[in-house]
Amino acid sequence: MFLSILVALCLWLHLALGVRGAPCEAVRIPMCRHMPWNITRMPNHLHHSTQENAILAIEQYEELVDVNCSSVLRFFLCAMYAPICTLEFLHDPIKPCKSVCQRARDDCEPLMKMYNHSWPESLACDELPVYDRGVCISPEAIVTDLPEDVKWIDITPDMMVQERPLDVDCKRLSPDRCKCKKVKPTLATYLSKNCSYVIHAKIKAVQRSGCNEVTTVVDVKEIFKSSSPIPRTQVPLITNSSCQCPHILPHQDVLIMCYEWRSRMMLLENCLVEKWRDQLSKRSIQWEERLREQRRTIQDKKKTAGRTSRSNPPKPKGKPPAPKPASPKKNIKTRSAQKKTNPKKV
């Protein structure tokens, strides 16, 4: 009895530790590099143990994706082959919604049948969860109202992010060759950049997930501006370049002004990263007020110009044309008149 309890306890601990230690890794499947999530976990829903195996398997659908037979096909395939990795669903990754699968199947199966193929059994829709009865993801949910724990990937000490060894070509891209331009934190810069998010954050980690992508993990402390909800937790910032500009190091406390793209927070060369000072919070708020005033002024001018153009029709440009002189009347003399006035001499 005691032995059975001990075995059960050890098994429970093994499973619990295994779940907590389940690794998340950067998405490396080329077809899925531009999904709203950039971190996945293996094995996936099709039981591929590595992304390399998943890449070989998903390649068979590249032509189908390229012909764009369905607007949700790529999303569905990536949700199956590179499932989103979140802390709450490490043991059982989130599946795509049944409706997404059905849309992709109904859109693309007629084309597949033209080439004597049918929708594969491995991608059957019957076993997938329904949106209102379980947890699942769809393109609409991510764009509009997806919960924070799904939209923003937590990278906490409980989750290990595996660093992939750099390719030979990537190793040649030495950081020393990158020359980052310093962007000064001024009002003029703020007005011209018109960034979509401004945050106070602490740099937690910087990792390269490919030759042309760097992921900077930051711990968000304050949010001064955002175009979409930003959680006050650890979030990834994506640099889609071989150069990490602006150049930052772990443990730095900074103010970041940059842009969002496809629901991903970016960290680009023309963005501003400044060592944190308390004065910067007041400045950023004042700058945002000036930016809004500038927008209101421009809108008011456009409205005024529109009203003026409607009330006063446009006048013709240039000088009015001069009146044409009356054409002189020609004194046409008939032959008989000519004979009378100019009689021939006899």
Swiss-Prot record:
Task: Name the major location.
Answer: secreted
Q: List the disulfide bonds.
A: C24-C85, C32-C78, C69-C108, C97-C136, C101-C125
Q: Does the keyword Metal-binding apply?
A: no
Name one process (GO BP) from the record. Answer: non-canonical Wnt signaling pathway
All residue ranges annotated as the NTR domain in the record: 178-307
Q: Which SUPFAM superfamilies match?
A: Frizzled cysteine-rich domain, TIMP-like
Query: Which residues are sugar-modified?
Result: N38, N68, N116, N194, N240
Q: Where is the composition biased (Pro residues)?
A: 313-326
PROSITE patterns annotated for this entry?
FZ, NTR
The coding gene here is SFRP4
Give the domain note: The FZ domain is involved in binding with Wnt ligands.
Top-rank taxon, per record = Eukaryota
What is the name of the protein in this document?
Secreted frizzled-related protein 4
Which residues fall in a compositionally biased region of kind Basic and acidic residues? Answer: 294-303
Signal peptide residues are 1-18
Give the UniProt subcellular location, in the record's own words. Secreted
